[in-house]
Regions:
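Surface-exposed amphipathic alpha-helical tracts and adjacent flexible/coil segments at the periphery
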Residues: 1-21, 25-32, 48-51, 57-85, ...
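A short acidic, helix-capping loop that chelates divalent metal ions and anchors anionic groups
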Residues: 34-37
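Glycine-rich, highly charged phosphate/nucleotide-binding loops
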Residues: 42-47
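Short active-site loop/helix that positions an aromatic residue
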Residues: 100-104
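Beta/alpha (TIM)-barrel catalytic core signal, keyed to glycine-rich beta->alpha loops juxtaposed to Asp/Glu
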Residues: 119
Length: 567
């Protein structure tokens, strides 16, 4: 089964990086309803251009609308989905299965994917979404590849193969709301899992590590053969808040692996470490154990270790490890101190300015560092330039020319899927020099800034024909413009049904219903005196004292943040 390589795009630059580096499909979000609210995302004008751009290059365009939807947002949600559908979106990713049901009823032919937050982790959940009319499910990142293969439901399977992991189950994080005041289920993740914590046994700290909830980055490049032979159809890269360099590099790497090119994986992984890594894990997808999922030392970009530093007069001396190179305009980080800098000036072993070093070198001590350290490279200037200058993707087209004296010039263009035929002007008998095949080929091949490149030109013509050069130029322009327009609108197939919302009687009680969370005996008594409807107790001993009261419930504490002050 041919796999789909699905890449992220937080903005137009990232989208182009994905398309030009081999993505089969791209996923992105509008300004509303996406689970990455703090990515740049696309306004309605931009999303239309993004969809057209993807379709022009034969790439599918998916849009995420995967937040949980409030009642007052339902109409806006449906309007946004309709706007996307009318403009040719290939699929919409949704978490809220209430919205799945509404869109399935309103737009029967709109392709819907259940996002990873929809918790597809078993046969039952996959079958549930299949029965709702969902075309594809994105499996939870807690599910192994063997489990995915064992789920025998006629539904497309998608799984994350690279990028950041969420410590909460399938990205459904309540911690962000509770601690950061921003709901991950509403696209506003506060990144609480990347903060430092102390693990306590009573009041005693029992861990030397700070970042107890911070996961490594998923990386399955070593397991590409197993992925190719799996039942997973779409291989998904995380990263809608990452840079165009990250998106382009990761997409190109997986493209090469899927196309079974010969890849020096160690060499490419070193590049990847420079671009972004929190250390790597094969994830639950490939049976990673708990400890190996986590990087509890640091939540940030680690870079690639390239050598060691020491202080020499007013400079920092760097002894580069074998095979490591440092360039002017690279960025480095001193691992133990956690401080970093750009290299504006690089000096060789003789203290002369240079642009590249591969053994001993010196940099200015801009940070006033006073001790030796391990050095990692966190930004590679040459690698960034390499991806900035990447050629745009070209689509192969063929032309067919028929030139008969006394008839219009007839030319067709084909991209292998679409065929357009145009006639223009009139072919005359040559009075002097007849047009030759090479002239026709030369004029039709001048595709300039179009996304096309010529693979073949077939010519049928009478002897001694004359064709105006202007006719060849005009018909080439007309054909390419029509083909661009046809490709851009390749998935516009809108169909809708009326959607009726039946009003139901309010289920809200006229009586106030008050719920309280308490920690102490005095708080419980105060709540009972005030006739609080429901009381949650965190302390098990305290709950045992009042367990016969039907209004009092014991609440398990998943994460112990701090001991509250007793009153």
């Amino acid at each position: 089964m041919k796999k789909e390589l699905l890449a992220p795009a937080g903005n137009m630059e990232c989208l182009k990086a994905a398309v030009f580096n081999g993505a089969d499909a791209v996923y992105m979000a509008c300004k509303s309803f996406g689970a990455r609210k703090f990515a740049n995302n696309f306004d309605n004008n931009e999303i239309v251009e993004a969809i057209k751009f993807c379709h022009l290059y034969g790439v599918k365009a998916y849009v995420t609308m995967n937040t949980l939807i409030k009642n007052e947002e339902v109409n806006s949600f449906i309007e946004q989905a309709e706007f996307l559908y009318r403009n040719g979106v290939d699929a919409i990713l949704i978490q809220d299965f209430g919205m799945i049901c509404l869109l399935r009823e309103k737009f029967p032919k709109l392709e819907i994917h259940a996002s990873t937050q929809a918790n597809t982790s078993s046969y039952e959940t996959a079958k549930f979404y299949y029965d709702l009319g969902v075309k594809r499910v994105v499996f939870s990142r807690e599910v192994s590849i063997d489990e995915i293969d064992s789920i025998d439901v006629p539904i497309e399977k998608e799984a994350f193969v690279h990028g950041a992991l969420c410590i909460s189950y399938s990205g459904e994080c309540l911690m962000s709301s509770m601690l950061g005041g921003r709901s991950g289920n509403r696209g506003e993740c506060a990144g609480c899992c990347r903060l430092p914590y102390t693990l306590l046994d009573g009041t005693t700290s029992i861990s030397n590590e700070k970042y107890l909830l911070s996961t490594k980055e998923l990386n399955t490049t070593k397991y590409i053969d197993r992925l190719i032979n799996s039942s997973i159809y779409s291989l998904k890269i995380e990263g809608r808040m990452k840079s165009p360099l990250y998106v382009g590099f990761i997409t190109k790497l997986y493209r090469r692996l899927l196309d079974e090119e010969k890849v020096d994986l160690d060499f490419e992984t070193d590049k990847l470490k420079t671009i972004f890594n929190r250390k790597f894990t094969k994830g639950r997808l490939f049976f990673e154990d708990d400890a190996s999922l986590m990087n509890q030392e640091s939540p940030n970009h680690q870079g690639l270790v390239i050598g060691n530093s020491s202080i020499y007069k007013d400079k920092i001396k760097i002894n580069l490890n074998r095979g490591r190179v440092l360039y002017q305009n690279d960025a480095i980080r001193f691992v133990n101190s956690g401080r970093g800098m750009m290299i504006n000036f690089l000096y060789d072993k003789d203290m002369k300015l240079c642009s590249k070093a591969d053994s001993v070198c010196y940099v200015d001590n801009k940070l006033n560092i006073s001790s030796s350290d391990i050095v990692s490279k966190t930004q590679d200037y040459n690698l960034e330039n390499e991806f900035k200058n990447i050629d745009s993707k070209k689509i192969e087209v063929s032309f067919s020319v028929v030139a008969r004296i006394g008839h219009p010039l007839k030319v067709s263009i084909s991209d292998g899927y679409n065929n357009i035929v145009e006639e223009i002007g009139c072919v005359n008998e040559a009075k002097n020099a007849p047009v030759d095949d090479q002239t026709i080929i030369s004029k039709l091949s001048k595709l300039g800034d179009t996304p096309f490149t010529v693979s073949n030109i077939k010519i049928e013509k009478d002897e001694n024909v004359f064709i105006q050069i202007k006719l060849l130029n005009d018909i080439r322009r007309i054909l390419t413009e029509k083909l661009i327009n046809m490709r851009e609108k390749s998935n516009i197939n809108f169909e809708s049904c009326d959607l009726v919302f039946e009003k139901s009687e309010s289920k809200c009680s006229s009586n106030d219903f008050i719920t309280c969370l308490v920690y102490t005996d005095s708080q419980i008594r105060a709540c009972l005196d005030m006739n609080v409807s429901r009381i949650y107790v965190c302390d098990k001993k305290l709950y045992d004292k009042y367990q016969n009261n039907s209004n009092i419930y014991y609440m398990l504490s998943l994460i112990h943040i701090s001991e509250p002050t007793r009153q």
